Amino acid sequence: MGITERLIEDVGIRRGVSRLTPEKIEKIVNAVLKGETGARLKTYAETCMRCGLCAEACHFALSHPGDPSYTPAGKVHQTMSVLLDKKGRVDPDFVYGMAQLAYTECNLCRRCVHLCPIGIDTAYIMSTVRRICHKLGVTPQYMQDTAHSHASTFNQMWVKDDEWTDSLIWQEDEAREEFPGLRIPLDKEGADIYYSVIAPEPKFRTQLIYQAAAIMHMAGVDWTMPAQTGWDNSDMCMFSGDFEMMGRLKRQHFESAQKLKVKRIVMGECGHAFRSVYDTGNR
């Protein structure tokens, strides 16, 4: 079964596809392939042996045994390989299926890379497919809404500055019942540690801030948290393919820490945010 046999409806993808023309698709695909990629993509495209070892690492493939279209190599075959072979001359219906596959059937986790005998980075290839989809204006609705929040507030949950500081003060008060001398220092210059979190913490899981503050307090750490934008280290734009906004987010994050002259940044739990901070968004 290929992607065309399992299409699902998404208003964001559908709306974006409805505005496409073959000429626009060809222009943007080739602009990305020629202007934003190079020998790396070409090497991956030409060296895959279709051995199938990558399938053993992919949770999508393991969830659909016997269907090669879910394997990492199969996903590349249905998307990037077609774009390269046809030099971007594909129709809007193809783009719909390509977007669904790239956004909903690959997590960019890179587990497949570790089993590939020649080290093909399928996540990089699929990330490039997402980049093309973003520049075409074809992104899943929920993901794009989150990216809009990043663009407007520099966090993914539409948290305003006063709501952020109120959450920190609230958790400091809560924690003092257990740790009377506990403080959550805001905008402290020269601290050893600048602690950053993801936006769902002040929005939904404020107790995680409490718990982190308790650890810092008991460890006697010299630390601080920012009172202004830059505190959210998450990055949905990395997932959507909006690399321009991704760069703005990371710049805001690092400049916030530099402004306070801290020695190091310590992050709360979030795998994608860590990748964005130390790797992708830092390029």
Question: What name fits each language-model region?
Answer:
Residues 16-20, 36-38, 42-45, 80-281:
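Iron-sulfur-cluster electron-transfer modules
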Residues 1-103:
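Ferredoxin-type iron-sulfur electron-transfer modules and their immediate structural context
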